[in-house]
Amino acid sequence: PARRARLGVGRALQLTNLFPHLTVLENVRLAVQSRAGIGMSMLSLWSGHTEVIQRAEHYLERVALTPKRGALVGTLSHGDQRKLEVAILLALEPAILMFDEPTAGMSVDEVPVVLELIHQVKAERDKTVLLVEHKMDVVRALADRIIVLHNGALVADGEPAEVMRSKIVQEAYLGTPEPA
């Protein structure tokens, strides 16, 4: 994981990889410290690294978790844990962001926050976003290019509208249209 981060690749997976006994802020702070090259010492932060705390709080604000900054991660809902993982991913500032089903397990009101975050990252145009997703509405909302695999084989690659018109994609993922 550390080598991947040094190479500029960050990922947020379906199963969260967090420190459940630390607070929300502490989890993001560790990512900020790692990115800044300060290391992982929890004590070093409290001895004058206020800019690290401010940076961590910035990422919490981006994912709408500021009100939960002092909560232990283990007490968060799955959706909030997913948002926290996105905050950590952003704090690592990778060149490539990989999202595996970024909205899986989230409530209906939590999904727009993460989708908007991914839209913002894409709008900045300085990072590559790779998205693994089975919900076609999410794919259509976020993708500039879609690559579809079916049974381990590449079946489509192109712009969203083109891929969505593909007969094999429709049969495999969208269902065969009902005859009129």
Feature map (PLM): residue ranges:
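Glycine-rich phosphate-binding loops of nucleotide-dependent enzymes
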Residues: 1-180
